[in-house]
Amino acid sequence: MHKIVFVTGNKGKFAEVRDILKNFGIEAIQNKDGYPELQEDELEPIAANGAQYVANKLNMPVMVDDSGIFINALNGFPGPYSRFVEDKLGNPKVLKLMEGEKDRSAYFKTVIGYCEPGQEPLVFPGVVEGKIAYEERGTGGFGYDPIFEYNGMTFGELGDEEKNKVSHRRRAVDNFLEWFIGGA
């Protein structure tokens, strides 16, 4: 069985990735050490830099995840600042920002960064399109899941198993697996 160190302090992210990888015979090992996060408007350089930093620090191959929700009516905000906005404002205030907005389209994006020590990092994006609900719905998932609607249900309503089949993180991990398994 392959083992991959996944660097995140986020229990929800780790559980989602762990559950996806185990279906492919890969064991995810959580490392909560973190890494210096670039302040960028795009997720790709953040994930690439983080993966390279940790791979060289730990001297082993690692995977990191940088994710965000991009709301079109807010010009892509909060995007790469999603965690900060979630911590400071939370879903109720994001919904308040959306009051009166007709365009509720949004997308979740995850970029998986993978790097081996001394190598250049690789990035694997995944996107899922949806819209911002008018209220929080569902108790599943984490973060923005209760306000992100996909095919009529929020990620918070879908439950982990269903969400893990269609999520942005799933799509990014699938892109990674296509490369990893194809090249293994």
UniProtKB/Swiss-Prot annotation:
Its EC number is 3.6.1.66. The keyword Transport does not apply. GO terms for cellular component: cytoplasm. InterPro entries: dITP/XTP_pyrophosphatase, ITPase-like_fam, RdgB/HAM1. Substrate binds at T8, G9, N10, K11, G12, K13, S67, F142, G143, Y144, D145, K163, H168, R169. SUPFAM superfamilies: ITPase-like. Binds 1 Mg(2+) ion per subunit. It catalyses: XTP + H2O = XMP + diphosphate + H(+); dITP + H2O = dIMP + diphosphate + H(+); ITP + H2O = IMP + diphosphate + H(+). It comes from the Archaea. GO terms for biological process: nucleotide metabolic process; purine nucleoside triphosphate catabolic process. The active site is at D66 (proton acceptor). The keyword Hydrolase applies. One of its GO terms (molecular function) is metal ion binding. Its cofactor is Mg(2+). Mg(2+) binds at E37, D66. It holds the Pfam family Ham1p_like. It is an enzyme of class 3 (hydrolase). Keywords: Hydrolase, Magnesium, Metal-binding, Nucleotide metabolism, Nucleotide-binding. Pyrophosphatase that catalyzes the hydrolysis of nucleoside triphosphates to their monophosphate derivatives, with a high preference for the non-canonical purine nucleotides XTP (xanthosine triphosphate), dITP (deoxyinosine triphosphate) and ITP. Seems to function as a house-cleaning enzyme that removes non-canonical purine nucleotides from the nucleotide pool, thus preventing their incorporation into DNA/RNA and avoiding chromosomal lesions. HAMAP family: Non_canon_purine_NTPase. PANTHER family: INOSINE TRIPHOSPHATE PYROPHOSPHATASE, INOSINE TRIPHOSPHATE PYROPHOSPHATASE/HAM1 PROTEIN. Homodimer. Belongs to the HAM1 NTPase family. This is dITP/XTP pyrophosphatase.
